[in-house]
Amino acid sequence: MSFKIEDIKNLNTQWPMPTSKKKIVIIGAGGIVKDAHLPAYQKGEYKVHGIYDLEESKAKKCAEDHSIDNVYQNLDDALNEKNIILDIAVPPAVLLDIVKKIPKNSICQLQKPVGNSLEEA
């Protein structure tokens, strides 16, 4: 298959918004969540249902600033919500431990590599 520069005009650069929106649960309350994910969800009119972070105070602050109804005190409660999309934005060192706990058939978005090196991943 060959690619021609003229083909660029046929590339889809915008996709339609979903007709039904699932609840979003965020794992991690660091800078990328505060500065990028939450503003993007707000712009797309997505409601974030809940947030969890090892540092509960960070999750509470994000919840207050972005009108998030649920702050989970433990990871299992967040992961076991039904009919959700998981947004996982944690450091690579802990990502794999979280991924192993995700229920089967879950929809999730991962933000980091699954390890600190190729060997770990």
Residue ranges and their predicted role:
Residues S2-H66:
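N-terminal Rossmann-like dinucleotide-binding module
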Residues H66, N70-A121:
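Beta-loop-alpha module in the N-terminal Rossmann-like domain of NAD(P)-dependent dehydrogenases
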